[in-house]
Swiss-Prot record:
Family membership noted in the UniProt record: Belongs to the UPF0434 family.
Pfam families xrefs: Trm112p
GO cellular component: cytosol
Protein name according to UniProt: UPF0434 protein Vapar_2640
Species name: Variovorax paradoxus (strain S110)
Gene3D superfamilies in alphabetical order: 2.20.25.10
Top-level lineage group: Bacteria
Length: 60
C-alpha cells in the first residue's frame, strides 16, 4: 500500500484513520471495528464490503 495514499484515505463511516494490514490485504478502522478489502491494489471502502474486526484482532 502506498504510504501517501494511506495518509489521504479515511474510514467512510467514522472519517478516522485507517491502518494497513498487509497479511490480509485490508485497511482497518479501529474506531468502526471494520476491515475494508483491497482488491488488485484498489481499496474497496464500502461499508457493505467490509468485515467486522474481532476483539482479538483489535488487541482487546
Amino acid at each position: 500500500m502506498d504510504t501517501k495514499l494511506l495518509e489521504l484515505l479515511v474510514c467512510p463511516v467514522t472519517k478516522g484513520p485507517l491502518t494497513w494490514n498487509p497479511e490480509k490485504q485490508e485497511l482497518c478502522s479501529r474506531s468502526a471495528r471494520l476491515a475494508y478489502p483491497v482488491r488488485d491494489g484498489i481499496p474497496v471502502l464500502l461499508e457493505n464490503e467490509a468485515r467486522t474486526l474481532s476483539d482479538e484482532e483489535l488487541g482487546l
